[in-house]
Amino acid sequence: QEQFQLFLFDADYWWERIVVPGGLADYIAEYLTQFYYHVWAGACILAFLYVLLQRLVWKLAKEQGAADVYYPLSFLPIIVLWHFMGDENAMLSLVVALLLALSASCWYADLKGKWQRVAYILIVLPLLYWTAGAAHFIFMGWVIVREFRLNLKGKNFWGGVGVFWGVGLWGIGCPLLASMWVQFPIYRLMGGIGYYRFPAVIPWIE
């Protein structure tokens, strides 16, 4: 992919990327993609990112009480992603965005206070959308599942329903609000701008 881009170390290039949702993930990914010129370096970068993703997946699984016997299952999302990234039009931005989303989920899991978690969601969800793009839906889904389970344990079903609607509407509202400032169709704001080179023809993972 490095032959299709020209990474520039100047402020204009930075602002060109950062003013769109997912721009930070795009910027980091494009910086790393430069090193694909050396095949061994590109392979090492991808391997390192995949290992980080797997560790984050397992950390979140352990937070939900997963037994060690399920450790091999933590590789399944990475294998699926590895397969998808075999497409030359799949961009490294997706991997970086997933790392940002899973990192945000891990930091959320470390919060203890109720109001700390509420403030974190209100601030981080839109911030994550702007930096990582539509991968913020992963963080949104994680929060909903985790809080719903906590409310069910406390026999507070309707509290879980409230979290579902509140967090869900806030997460969906982020790309809708972004559409007021950036000139992209809704389907691209909802699906990620820089994850695939030709977004109108994203293939099925087969």
Residue ranges and their predicted role:
Residues 18, 22, 46, 69-116, ...:
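Membrane-interface micro-motifs in multi-pass membrane enzymes
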Residues 34-35, 129:
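Solenoid-like repeat scaffolds
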